[in-house]
């Protein structure tokens, strides 16, 4: 590991960590008993429920600290048995804390509206109203307390265990990488992503083929995990009276069906915009279409040099500081305090994430840096998440529970600050400008084609899963069908990725369902916000910071309306954000012939 975790605990499994866990476990048990002893919320016992809520919030803060620490350790070394054992033990402790939430659901489920309204209006609950209203909404579709507790207990060794199995498989999985020069290397799966963004198409294809051969070797286990996770959710939905499997996803995203429909109405009306981006990519490669493994690939501009970690830090810091000094200052804090685990090594889990502790008010960023421009964007993306946590550091825990739709807005806003900051630097060459424009429009293709493929695949998968488990062959077939439908003729024959359902971690995250459309939502909302920044200048930044602070205080629609005055329930908002990709696309199209001879025809 090359990050500093000592502000969590001086060392793993040391006396400080043991005492922390013992006290947390004891306090959870005490609060669980206290909550279970109370009758449903009424005028006489309001102070008792207020005490439970206050103590539960404090426990949530402490649990976030321990969870963040353990997730850092397990992700950084997925082969360490002690870390994996601690991860499983933590899941058990979280399940016990979840039982307090079950009691809270019981407490507010049948409470008359006037008593509930009076209760949440108390001064001690200022800032927690949105959390409590959502709790009541969830309570109205909850099973009996006994069944909810049973579901929590079973989840530990059921749906969550399947998720942990996938994490274990992916962190230990390796693939054969055959380079164009004939050199062969055995690599951890965590390094595949960067190779799929390599400028050389032959390298990308080798990483794609080698990676999929590895995923094929574990296809049965991956399919079993995917079927079990979805099957559990569908069963619980049925017992809770959830009408449609997307209802829970919408609740978690804090948006209405109207808003999601507006987004996809605009997206499907403008599919030709991201398809044109891919056609330009295909033209630069001298092909008529692109394979799936080319989706996130950069255009192969000559003399592209690897970017060292020090160069990456400087690029992000300078761009952030120039456009948004507060963000640049925060990024320097990340670097100075060594909050980022970036080095490639065996045993690291694939992917990237940001995790925060509500107790220490710090964040950590996990990624694997392989000297590509895409990795620099990942650094900016995850730092956007970390900055969001920094802006909310003084917000009470109940108001820090915000949806992925708004979380992904903060991260992609960070990407835009980086790309536009570099584009506005007068010292960069035409080739460097072309690279940055390629990154900006290339991300448009990912968020407007790749992510919708995930969403449409998962919808179809859940529809079919109602009738029984899907075989490996059907999962592959369904993925290919979906990729063809969304990408259209820009996807070259045979260029599909039949194992995308296995290699994509997000399908196996058990805490959130449909972990895909929030990315498209965040990408487009961030473009809308960034357009406001360009128009209003630094006068917009206080509005943006208020947007970040209020992310857990209301629905996404209301937060956006309240802070920047936009109506995201209308397709027009999303259409305008999608069409904003036209300008960088045309700039790239004009610039390419100057830096890429093959693009002159």
Residues covered by each model-derived region:
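A well-structured
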Residues: 1-302, 554, 590-600
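Catalytic zinc-binding patch centered on the HExxH motif and its immediate surroundings
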Residues: 305-307, 340-361
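Post-HEXXH active-site segment of zinc metalloproteases
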Residues: 377, 389-412
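Short pre-active-site segment immediately N-terminal to the catalytic Zn-binding motif
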Residues: 304-309, 360-380
């Amino acid at each position: 590991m090359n990050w500093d975790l000592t502000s969590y605990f001086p060392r793993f499994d040391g006396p400080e960590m043991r005492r922390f866990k013992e006290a947390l476990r004891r306090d959870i048990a005490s609060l669980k008993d206290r909550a279970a002893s109370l009758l449903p919320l009424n005028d006489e016992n309001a102070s008792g429920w207020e005490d439970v809520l206050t103590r539960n919030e404090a426990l949530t803060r402490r649990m976030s600290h321990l969870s963040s620490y353990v997730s850092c350790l397990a992700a950084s070394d997925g082969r360490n048995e002690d870390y994996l054992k601690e991860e499983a033990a933590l899941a058990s402790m979280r399940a016990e804390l979840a039982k307090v939430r079950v009691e809270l659901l019981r407490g507010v489920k049948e409470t008359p509206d006037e008593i509930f309204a009076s209760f949440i209006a108390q001064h001690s609950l200022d800032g927690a109203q949105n959390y409590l209203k959502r709790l009541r909404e969830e309570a109205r579709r909850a099973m009996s307390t006994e069944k909810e507790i049973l579901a929590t207990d079973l989840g530990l060794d059921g749906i969550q265990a399947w998720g942990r199995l996938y994490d274990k498989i992916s962190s230990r999985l390796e693939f054969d990488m055959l380079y164009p020069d004939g050199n062969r290397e055995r690599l951890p799966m965590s390094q595949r992503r960067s190779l799929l963004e390599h400028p050389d198409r032959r390298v990308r294809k080798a990483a794609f083929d080698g990676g999929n051969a590895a995923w094929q070797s574990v296809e049965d286990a991956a399919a079993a995990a995917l079927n079990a996770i979805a099957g559990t959710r569908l069963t619980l939905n049925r017992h809770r009276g959830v009408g449609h499997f997307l209802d829970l996803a919408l609740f978690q995203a804090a948006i209405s069906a109207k808003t999601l429909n507006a987004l996809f109405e605009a997206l499907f009306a403008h599919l030709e915009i991201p398809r044109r981006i891919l056609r330009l990519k295909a033209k630069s490669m001298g092909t008529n279409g692109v394979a799936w493994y080319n989706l996130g690939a950069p255009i192969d501009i000559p003399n592209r040099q690897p970017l060292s970690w020090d160069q990456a830090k400087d690029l992000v810091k300078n761009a952030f500081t120039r456009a948004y000094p507060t963000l640049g200052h925060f990024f320097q804090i990340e670097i100075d305090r060594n909050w980022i685990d970036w080095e490639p090594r065996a045993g690291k889990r694939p992917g990237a994430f940001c995790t925060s502790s509500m107790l220490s008010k710090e964040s950590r960023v996990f990624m694997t840096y392989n000297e590509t421009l895409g990795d620099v964007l990942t650094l900016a993306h995850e730092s956007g998440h970390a900055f969001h946590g920094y802006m909310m550091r003084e917000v009470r825990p109940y108001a820090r529970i915000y949806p992925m739709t708004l979380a992904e807005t903060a991260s992609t806003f960070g990407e835009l600050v980086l790309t536009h900051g570099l584009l506005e630097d007068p010292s960069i060459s035409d080739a460097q400008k072309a690279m940055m424009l390629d990154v900006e429009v290339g991300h448009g293709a990912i968020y407007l084609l790749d992510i919708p493929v995930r969403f449409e695949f998962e919808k179809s998968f859940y529809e079919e899963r109602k009738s029984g488990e899907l075989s490996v062959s059907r999962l592959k077939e369904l993925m290919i069908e979906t990729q063809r439908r969304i990408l259209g003729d820009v996807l070259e024959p045979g260029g599909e990725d039949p194992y995308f359902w296995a290699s994509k971690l997000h399908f196996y995250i058990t805490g959130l369902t449909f972990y895909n459309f929030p990315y498209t939502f965040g990408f487009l909302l961030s473009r809308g916000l960034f357009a406001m920044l360009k128009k209003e200048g630094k006068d917009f930044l206080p509005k943006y910071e208020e947007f970040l602070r209020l992310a857990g205080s209301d629905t996404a629609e209301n937060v956006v309306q309240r802070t920047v005055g936009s109506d995201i329930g209308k397709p027009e908002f999303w259409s305008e954000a999608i069409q904003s990709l036209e300008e960088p696309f045309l700039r790239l199209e004009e610039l390419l012939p100057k830096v890429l001879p093959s693009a002159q025809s």
